[in-house]
Design a protein with these regions (language model features):
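Aromatic pocket-lining residues of Rossmann-like dinucleotide-binding sites
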Residues: 35
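Conserved glycine-rich Rossmann-like NAD(P)H-binding loop of the short-chain dehydrogenase/reductase
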Residues: 38-54
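Rossmann-fold scaffold of SDR-type NAD(P)-dependent oxidoreductases
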Residues: 21-22, 94-102
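Conserved amphipathic alpha-helix within the SDR
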Residues: 57-60, 67-71, 76-92
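Flexible N-terminal pre-Rossmann segment of NAD(P)-dependent oxidoreductases
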Residues: 1-19
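NAD(P)H-binding Rossmann-fold N-terminus in SDR/SDR-like oxidoreductases
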Residues: 26, 30, 104
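Conserved glycine-rich cofactor-binding loop
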Residues: 17, 22-26, 48
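Conserved mid-core segment of classical short-chain dehydrogenase/reductases
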Residues: 81, 104-116
Length: 116
């Protein structure tokens, strides 16, 4: 993705801190890259922490900026709390969230538990 593919001005997200769940691959990775190019500090998380680490390194190598990887299973409430506490303490408050992580659960929404 190059800047000509983005419809927003350079630096639009300078000073912002965004968390993208499921940010190691696919659409989450693409959105994380877009936020990074617009100037945001980007945090990505996913169950496969190693994949997130590789993505963070690749994005920073390609575009500079700051991408922080977190291994986190969002189905575990305590893991989410630990991750967001760590972000807050080490980096400051989040200013944006893309809840991209997904699962394929064939069920009525009201029948789903917090764990899917």
């Amino acid at each position: 993705m190059d800047m000509s593919q983005l419809m927003f001005r350079d630096g639009l997200m300078d000073g912002e801190r965004v968390l993208v769940t499921g940010g190691g691959t696919g659409l989450g990775k693409e959105m994380a890259e877009g936020f990074l190019k617009l100037g945001a500090e980007v945090h990505i998380c996913g169950r496969r922490g190693g994949v997130c680490e590789e993505t963070a390194e690749a994005l920073m190598s390609a575009h500079g900026g700051k991408v922080v990887a977190h291994g986190c299973d969002i189905r575990v409430a305590e893991a989410i709390n630990d991750m967001t506490d760590q972000i807050w303490m080490n980096h400051g408050p989040l200013t944006g969230l893309v809840n991209n992580a997904a699962g394929n659960f064939i069920s009525r929404t009201e029948d789903l538990s917090i764990r899917g």
